Amino acid sequence: MNKLISWKPRASIHNLFIRAKIINNIRIFFINRGLLEVETPVMSHTTVPDIYLFPFQTNLYFLEKVPEKGVPMYLITSPEYHMKRLLAAGSGPIFQICHSFRNQEYGNYHNPEFTLLEWYRPYYNMVDIMDEVNIFLQTIIHCDSAEMLSYQQVFRLHVGIDPLLAELDELNQVLVKFNLSSTISLYNDRDKLLDFLFLMLVRPHLGNNKPVFIYNFPASQSLLAELNSDDHRVAERFEVYFHGIELANGSRELTDADLQRERFMQENNKQVAMNRPPRLIDEQLLAALECGLPSCSGVALGIDRLLMLTLKAKHISEVMAFSVTDA
């Protein structure tokens, strides 16, 4: 018997009891508000074209297919596409608690396999769904009511620029001003520079005392969201931060199948420009949109991170039985 092998869960049994209690409270919250709990596949024939997300791929072997190759399948990065197909089929308001997978870094706030809460509300606009997220957080983790700030406001406040107007030269000048120019090599990609400045200069200030909603992100950073009808430079998308941790993101969902296809193709063009293969477009999702996805808003929220805040945990492994290093 090898006594050196670590086999015990990293999280304490106490933390696992709290985890179970909070997940149960989440279910009660949504059931009491009239949402249907659904289950959708964690393995899909397609994946997201998003250049910032890296899916796990496997092969499914059917007898009628070429056996040595199999059929490519992907672990979901989110249940969004399947849930939108349910919405288009007339499900009404729905929620789901499921495992999702992203083949990316492991760290304090990241595990490749994580638990995601996702919900959708037909006929809710962005403000409606933000209000519900605010009530959800107050109910589940007993925090104060959130602060609401636009993406433009927080950049002006913490960076001193207007992110919707700033050109590449101005963004690079900000890097020099804050001694960040040696830490990033992508000086000619506006969106990546904005992301980097948000991460380094804005995010540390967010939600130190209460949650903060950042809304109206640039349209170029919003693959699945509707554009703001008054200002097409921004999309009706938001992110939620508390104590510097990104907890959730949501949006008023894009319902136009042709526009969604165009955005997917644009994202695949970026993949090719980065010497990556394009990703197969989800035709089933587009068919659902074409059939008629109702006007709706949705949210994805990381349950593990929510638990970290509740338990004042420093590492995500403290709130799950087994992280990737112990799996």
From Swiss-Prot:
Binding site for substrate: S78, P79, E80, Y120, E253
Gene Ontology terms: cellular component: cytosol
Highest taxon of source: Bacteria
GO molecular function terms noted in the UniProt entry: acid-ammonia (or amide) ligase activity; ATP binding; lysine-tRNA ligase activity; tRNA binding
Residue sites binding ATP per the record: R102, N103, Q104, N111, E246, L247, G302
Catalytic activity: D-beta-lysine + L-lysyl-[protein] + ATP = N(6)-((3R)-3,6-diaminohexanoyl)-L-lysyl-[protein] + AMP + diphosphate + H(+)
GO biological process, any: lysyl-tRNA aminoacylation
UniProt-listed InterPro entries: Aa-tRNA-synt_II, aa-tRNA-synth_II, aa-tRNA-synth_II/BPL/LPL, EpmA
Record function comment: With EpmB is involved in the beta-lysylation step of the post-translational modification of translation elongation factor P (EF-P). Catalyzes the ATP-dependent activation of (R)-beta-lysine produced by EpmB, forming a lysyl-adenylate, from which the beta-lysyl moiety is then transferred to the epsilon-amino group of a conserved specific lysine residue in EF-P.
Record family assignment: Belongs to the class-II aminoacyl-tRNA synthetase family. EpmA subfamily.
Record's protein name: Elongation factor P--(R)-beta-lysine ligase
The organism of origin for this protein: Baumannia cicadellinicola subsp. Homalodisca coagulata
Gene assigned in the entry: epmA
